[in-house]
Amino acid sequence: MLTYKFLLIKLTATVLIIFPTLSFSVTVNDELRFATQMLSSGSMISLESAENSALMATVGEPKASLGHWLRAQSLYGLAGVGYDFDKKDRPFLEEARVRMIPLPNNLLPGNIFTFQTANSNSQYVLLMETSAFRLFVYKIDEFGNLSYENSFYSSIGLSGDNKTKEGDKKTPIGVYRFIKEISNPRADGFLGDIAMTLDYPNAQDKRDGRTGYGIWIHGVPKNTYVRSPKASDGCLALSNKDIELLKQYITYKKTHIVIVSKVSWLDPYTWKNNSKLIQNLFTSTSQVAGNNKNKVVAYYRVSKDRPSVALIRRGEIFYRDYWDETNKGLKKLLSERLN
């Protein structure tokens, strides 16, 4: 049984790396994050702030169960009433822990590098950090620079990430394209009104023997705001409102999502230098150099134990090329044509 005091310690200790939060207009997600942070402080003033933010969250979204739960805990604390938690509180504790993870400020992901090129395929790229249950959207400008656009809370597979086989209830790690949109993906409405399909398994997944299919980004039942952090069969599950917002960033068969366990955050100066280094590596790599029809559009690093992925335009056709980074440069493993 967890006590109220232990909850405060547990939530605070979970956040090991602290970033300043980004500045943007206050949303339900922001209110939930702030309420959780204030509740973890434990002072009377903080509890009052937590109660107020939790109330605002539930006014903005009555289906936000975490908001109701946080408000109840705040009121218990203000009244000096002790409370013991049991298993029915666990989903709220898990979501509250996730809400405590701050967003990065003025940093760029070292997992994604984009380059200046005409017809670069998409204006946006998505990045899912499964350990933070956070889906980031980045805009790509005409010079190949990345800038933060938006982010969303997202549930992942019930058994975590790093999918290897069909039915393991894990979210895959890798680089994937959005393929198409499905309306009313399940008759009972459990997946919301919209699902966006991904092209899992990709060529590298197949080569490595990873199986399964039907990895989507979808919504939640109408009587729900969000699901618990680990709740799906392997898909990414967003709130129905967030799914509608996400749609504006997606161009089917063009927009990519990079799914990683942990993002490698870089300051903009380091990101730019790494981007130039990668461009130079491709220029000096025999498989690419000497063919002016090849244009490197983007370069994605998934993890140290996975090949990196280059999005290449050859004429009017796009390819995903899979590369090993070695001490002698880049070694091409596989090329996948994107229809």
Residue ranges and their predicted role:
Residues 75-109:
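Alpha-helical linker/edge segments of TPR/alpha-solenoid repeat scaffolds
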Residues 309-339:
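Short beta-strand edge/turn micro-motifs at domain boundaries
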Residues 29-56, 60:
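Alpha-helical segment of the N-proximal tetratricopeptide repeat
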Residues 103-215, 221-225, 331:
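Gly/Pro-biased beta-strand-loop elements
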Residues 37, 74, 180-280:
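Exported/periplasmic cell-wall-interacting domains
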